[in-house]
Structures are given as C-alpha cells and as structure tokens.
Regions:
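Histidine-centered active-site loop/cap adjacent to the catalytic His
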Residues: 90-146
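Alpha-helical cap/lid subdomain in secreted, periplasmic
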Residues: 1-108
C-alpha cells in the first residue's frame, strides 16, 4: 500500500463454517443463534483483530468490510421457511443448492447474491433498479440489499 496509497480495500466476511452445526456452534459460544454469533464474529472479532488493525497500520487507506454472510443466513432461512422461488436444496450441487458440502462452500445462489452485494458495495449500484438477470426466480437483488 505504500507504493499505491490510493487503493481502496474491500474485505468480505463469509458466513460461519459447517451450517448443519450452526445452532450448536452458537450455543457453544454462549449465544442464542447463528445470527448472534455472526454479529459477534463481524463486529468484535474480525473488526478488532483484522480490519481495525489494518486501518491503524494504513491510516490513509480506505478499508471496507462487507459481511456477505448475512445473505447466506437469509437464503438458508428462506429455504427453511419454503420461501425460495427456485428448486434449491440446502446441500447438493453448485447449481442447485445453498451449500455444496458440509463445510459450507457456497452454491450458485449464494455466489450470485454475493456478487450483487459486491456490485452494490463497491460500485454503489442500486440493486432494486438493476435489471441483471440472476437466472433465479427468487429476488436475489432484494436479498442482497437486506
């Protein structure tokens, strides 16, 4: 950054690993649910141990965090409540699932939503006015905005 002081840095904060164990993981941490754990992970852990330290080391550099994990939790919750307008399973192939494996690697619906989050965060695109066809019936633009 010393050679390119005008750079802006965007750091994505992914969801917690092993989605099948989210509730137990949250309870083991003394919290009620995965959303509470993620909020702690973003604000108290990632910001304090990584992002705030980078900002101190490079005060003239703009450093943003993008907690993309929220969209993953929203999509998982929509799946649990049968609110997705697509035939998407919780675990399965990249094209047809939220997660591709037990660790929680993301399927296409999550990756596409994440791309929209980046589009909005980095370029300031207003997603409700954006007509990019995600290939999904579920309104991923709205999920990405929330």
């Amino acid at each position: 950054m010393q050679k390119n002081p005008n750079v802006k840095i965007f750091i994505s904060i992914p969801p917690i690993d092993f989605p099948a164990d989210w509730q137990q993981t949250a309870e083991d941490a003394g919290l009620n649910n995965i959303r509470e754990l993620y909020e702690f992970f973003v604000n108290d852990h990632t910001h304090k141990t990584v992002i705030d330290q980078l900002r101190e080391m490079y005060p003239s550099t703009v450093i943003f965090s993008i907690p993309t994990g929220w969209a993953t939790f929203d999509l998982e919750e929509m799946h649990q409540n049968d609110l997705l307008l697509d035939d998407i399973s919780l675990f399965g192939s990249f094209e047809r699932a939220i997660f591709t494996d037990a660790k929680g690697h993301q399927g296409e619906v999550v990756v596409t939503t994440g791309a929209l989050i980046w589009l909005s965060s980095i370029y300031g695109v207003h997603l409700r006015n954006n007509d990019f066809d995600t290939g999904f019936n579920t309104d991923l633009h709205t999920v990405a905005e929330e």
